[in-house]
A protein has these predicted regions:
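Histidine-dependent nucleotide/RNA phosphoesterase domain, centered on the 2H-phosphoesterase fold
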Residues: 1-175
């Protein structure tokens, strides 16, 4: 069986709700928002993989040393090429970048774009969103590395968590 897989950082349910509420109040755009249950930050994209590759990914992730990670989100952005409105960290995060690059190297993944941490808010956007309220100001303490499967449904694409590996909690959180 084939699976469309990626590794990412999932938001907790209350964080997804906070982000969805902010998005509904702060952004004006004619295109519908991404399903809030899909909010996540992609670290490594595998594409289509079979069951044996899925098993290998799970095994490697179980053995992987994982860092404590947090991100402060405050930058609204737009990529015209992929027609995506997104929220990005307001400051570079070396630990996050290093971890994503380590995952890509471990799984020998090549991507034509460098790692650019973000949470997609609107897809199929022909133009940027207009900010009509306060800018975003979210600090997220990431709880787990998550292996997701992307599935097409009648309601649109949905991301299903197949496995989670806890991340350590830092001694102190700094934005």
């Amino acid at each position: 069986m084939q699976h469309r897989l990626f590794l990412g950082l999932d938001l907790l349910p209350h964080q997804k709700q906070q982000l969805a509420t902010w998005q509904a109040q702060a952004l004006a755009h004619p295109k519908a928002a991404v399903f809030s249950g899909n909010y996540h930050l992609t670290l490594a994209f595998f594409g289509e993989r079979d069951d044996s590759e899925l098993t290998d990914i799970v095994q490697h992730c179980q053995e992987l040393v994982k860092p404590a990670l947090h991100s402060h989100f405050g930058l609204l952005g737009y990529w015209s090429e992929s027609e995506t409105v997104y929220l990005a960290p307001s400051q570079p995060n070396r630990q996050l970048n290093d971890f994503a690059n380590r995952l890509r190297a471990l799984f020998e993944l090549s991507d034509r774009h460098p790692f650019s941490p973000h949470i997609s808010l609107i897809r199929g956007a022909k133009k940027p969103a207009t900010l009509v309220a306060e800018p975003a100001n979210f600090t997220l303490q990431w709880q787990a590395l998550t292996l997701f499967r992307s599935r097409s449904t009648n309601a649109g694409v949905r991301y299903q968590a197949l496995a989670r590996w806890p991340l350590p909690t830092p001694a102190r959180l700094t934005p």
